[in-house]
């Protein structure tokens, strides 16, 4: 084989030939040892590697089961791309790298892999891993051998590889498009074209360029492991400027009971559809969304500050007084609770109910009525429940309250810094990278506040992922450890109240449009009718409130004021239909689009168009070219298989298999829709059931 392999690569604006090494021909003497340290125990070779594999799959039976295998691997090391076709070659190559760098005990080379969770399923049996850090079962952040440390660059960037390369300056090797047909079965002996090799080349070279760009502001020992690590570091630095912030943090220390209660109270965004307008194609639909919703709540609202105290609630008057004066959390039990008729979007999710009676009606996972239910709520959530529902009795247990006030100024200033930077750079093509960096940091600030302090440890052992359940004593020790750690600075309750305030503001928007609401999702509401003046009035009122509290929720850019927290009008829709949460299609300026959780937007819209358009967005409609896949995990020790006459080693693997997607509405949900919309067939069906 020639020393160099020709690769036809996709560059930023053109294609060109690039040259790679085959692993057996790589000149290891060109590698330079250069060690960087972080503390006593983190010692790394300065130059990281990037690694990727390409795989094929074959059926193992007639029931849709597959196994996958690697047919080529590629590495970029110190800017050089290297190919190999078999696992034994990879093992030998890595051993040679370790020898070339003359790594001593405790010294490691970092190997970045974009979506390490996929590659790890293949490599786990070919290396002796001493430490695997899994964020969830089969979700790998790092995996270490004595001299290698595999890291996930997807979790570092929070972007697809294509977007990571596209959004990073000084990158030349772009992610290939349609240069490699994944449906073709290839083996380690299958010849690859220069274009196919170029696709493989770019995957590791482009990623290497991204990592090296990031390392201009860091070194391999200091660079964060995740995207939120950057903003956590910035915010910690800002908060440490004021020693009083540490005192507030320690005074806010949670007991285990209080932490569990806050975990019960935590919810994400409110995503749901109006049962009166679900499963209907609606014309001339408007849309508003909240500008930078979560960051706005953090600069404008009052949050728990200081100790949480236990309170006894004996009557409604006491409850109302505490809920108005403090931030509160508690477990609420309601008897004979029922949604008011004029409320289009039910607020209480079944999934958050701690107890739920048998006599109940549930629409798309939301409570319409129940003979009783128990749920943990903040005072913000309780106010929304009180507006939406009527009930016969209420009981309040485990009531806790904390004094409230603005978040520390240093944290609010950091949020405004990112908002200003993002706003000033928006639309500036020359500074797109800085814009995306500021935007991602702005959006990440909320995320770091809701990191689970008592995250369950996932133990990886011989290919198995075991969730280690913490005892009560271990949980208490973990909480104590968190508050004693001088790097800790965030109050978990802040994140819980961020989302509660955001849901409150979304509820305000739903109140603005009333029964004209069609759909809402976290920070946006879609509706029929003309409500522009209503939203203008709401925005004016909100800005007056901010001015009164001396909250500056805007910046000036080129003579224009850009606000956080107000409702901005979006492009409307010619036609719109929803079948429930995370499930809708629309026509916008004549273009058909689709948003369905688990369904490819592009492929879904294309197939829906071929089926006949938006009116085929119906219950039981099957999408065959959905872009949806299922993951089939196969565990096996190292063994040989023969495919198309080629015998090679393989082991555990992961087959990604295409599957169909069927639009669904449950029978119960459909019954509710037909009843409230007064459809004829509902009455006929009801009468028939009575006869039977």
Regions found by a protein language model. Give the residues of each.
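N-terminal accessory regions of nucleic-acid-interacting proteins
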Residues: 1-49, 53
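Conserved Rossmann-like nucleotide-cofactor binding loop
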Residues: 56
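Conserved acidic
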Residues: 48-50, 59, 65-114, 120-692
């Amino acid at each position: 084989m020639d020393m160099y392999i020709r690769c036809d690569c996709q560059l930023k604006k053109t294609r060109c030939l690039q040259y790679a090494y085959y692993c057996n021909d790589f000149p290891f003497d060109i590698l330079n040892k250069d060690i960087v340290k972080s503390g006593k125990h983190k010692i790394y070779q300065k130059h990281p590697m990037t690694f990727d594999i390409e795989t094929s799959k074959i059926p193992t039976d007639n029931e849709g089961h597959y196994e996958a295998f690697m047919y080529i691997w590629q590495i970029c090391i110190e800017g050089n791309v290297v190919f190999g076709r078999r696992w034994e070659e990879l093992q030998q190559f890595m051993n040679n790298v370790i020898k070339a760098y003359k790594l001593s005990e405790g010294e490691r080379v970092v190997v970045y892999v974009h979506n390490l969770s996929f590659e790890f399923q293949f490599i786990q049996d070919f290396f002796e891993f001493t430490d695997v850090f899994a964020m969830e079962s089969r979700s790998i952040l790092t995996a270490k051998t004595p001299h290698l440390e595999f890291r996930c660059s997807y979790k570092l960037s929070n972007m697809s590889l294509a977007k990571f390369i596209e959004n990073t300056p000084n990158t030349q090797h772009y992610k290939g498009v349609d240069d490699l047909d994944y449906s073709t079965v290839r083996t380690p002996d299958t010849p690859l074209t220069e274009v196919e090799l170029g696709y493989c080349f770019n995957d590791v070279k482009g990623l290497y360029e991204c990592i090296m760009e990031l390392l201009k502001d860091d070194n391999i020992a200091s660079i964060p492991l995740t995207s939120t690590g950057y903003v956590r570091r910035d915010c910690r630095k800002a908060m440490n400027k004021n020693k009083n912030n540490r005192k507030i943090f320690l005074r806010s220390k949670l007991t285990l009971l209080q932490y569990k209660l806050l975990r019960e109270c935590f919810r994400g965004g409110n995503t749901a559809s109006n049962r009166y307008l679900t499963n209907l194609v609606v014309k001339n639909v408007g849309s508003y969304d909240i500008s930078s919703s979560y960051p706005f709540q953090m600069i404008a609202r009052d949050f728990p500050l200081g100790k949480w105290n236990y309170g006894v609630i004996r009557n409604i008057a006491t409850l109302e007084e505490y809920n108005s004066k403090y931030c509160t959390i508690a477990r609420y039990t309601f008897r004979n609770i029922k949604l008011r008729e004029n409320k289009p979007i039910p607020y209480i999710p079944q999934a958050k109910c701690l107890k739920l009676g048998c006599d109940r009606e549930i629409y798309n996972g939301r409570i319409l009525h129940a003979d009783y239910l128990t749920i943990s709520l903040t005072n913000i959530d309780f106010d929304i429940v009180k507006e939406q529902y009527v009930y016969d009795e209420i009981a309040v247990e485990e009531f806790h309250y904390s004094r409230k006030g603005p978040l520390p100024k240093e944290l609010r200033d950091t949020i405004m810094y990112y908002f200003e930077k993002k706003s000033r750079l928006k639309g500036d093509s020359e500074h797109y990278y800085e814009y995306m960096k500021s935007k991602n940091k702005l959006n990440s600030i909320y995320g770091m506040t809701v990191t689970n302090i008592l995250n369950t440890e996932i133990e990886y052992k011989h290919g198995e992922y075991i969730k280690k359940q913490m005892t009560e004593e271990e949980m208490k020790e973990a909480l104590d450890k968190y508050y004693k750690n001088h790097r800790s600075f965030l109050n978990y309750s802040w994140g819980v109240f961020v989302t509660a305030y955001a849901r409150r503001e979304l509820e305000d928007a739903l109140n603005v449009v009333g029964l004209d609401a069609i759909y809402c999702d976290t920070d946006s509401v879609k509706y029929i009718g003309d409500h522009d003046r209503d939203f203008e009035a709401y925005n004016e009122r909100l800005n007056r409130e901010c001015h009164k509290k001396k909250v500056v929720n805007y910046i000036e850019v080129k003579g224009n004021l850009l606000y956080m927290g107000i409702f901005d009008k979006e492009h409307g829709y010619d036609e719109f239909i929803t079948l429930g949460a995370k499930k809708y299609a629309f026509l916008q300026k004549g273009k058909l689009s689709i948003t369905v959780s688990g369904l490819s937007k592009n492929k879904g819209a294309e197939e829906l168009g071929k089926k006949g358009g938006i009116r085929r967005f119906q219950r039981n409609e099957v999408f065959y070219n959905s872009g949806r896949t299922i993951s089939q995990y196969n565990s096996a020790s190292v063994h040989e298989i023969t495919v198309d006459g080629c015998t090679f080693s393989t082991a555990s693997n992961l087959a990604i298999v295409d599957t169909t997607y069927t639009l669904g509405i449950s029978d119960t949900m459909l019954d509710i829709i037909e009843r409230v919309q007064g459809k004829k067939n509902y009455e006929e069906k009801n009468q028939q059931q009575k006869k039977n």
